[in-house]
Amino acid sequence: MGWWRETIDIVKENDPAARNSLEVLLTYPGVKALAAHRLSHFLWKHGFKLLARMHSQFWRFWTQIEIHPGAQIDSGVFIDHGSGLVIGETAIVEKGVLLYHGVTLGGTGKDSGKRHPTVRKGALISAHAQVIGPIEIGEKAKVGAGAVVVSDVPSDVTVVGIPARIVRVHGEKDEPTIHEVEEKRKYYLDKLEHAREASHHSSSL
């Protein structure tokens, strides 16, 4: 009962509308989707890939939440509402992450191997945010509603917009610090893009 208890408790901690454990267990689609994913992921890891996909697609129909059975999701994750949420095959979601409806943890279609995001402990991804590619969302970072994130987000910052930009660091609107962090982020993003372009060029020769 450890996983169930932890999952129900995190819902009650984060959703004031959750009145009791039975209500959470019976009526919250995020809880059902995460529970189903545990079996899908087990089947996937043990080589029953078609069965895993069929199982995950069945629960996609019932919950409107699509989680690829290959995705790695820790315990203590909260999916609120959940409708339209998509988590790709190589995504990693750590403990204490909050995901809202319409979120996509997706791929660019250009990467191979690790193609989807890693979301570190305690991060929050708001409704309809699109987090794309093999990037990392740092611990306790917050991604605003409708943001499009295509590069790493440092720990304990808030990003908003298209493309996402940093607006708060450690909960404060400290302009010099925000500017410094953004400059570093852009520098490393440019280096990463150049490395990817060089890799694609060499592979096409």
What residue ranges belong to the model's regions?
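Structural signal for interior beta-strand "rungs" in well-ordered beta-sheet cores
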Residues: 60-167
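Terminal amphipathic alpha-helical/low-complexity segments used for targeting or macromolecular assembly
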Residues: 1-63, 174-205
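Intrinsic disorder/low-complexity segments
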Residues: 123, 173-174
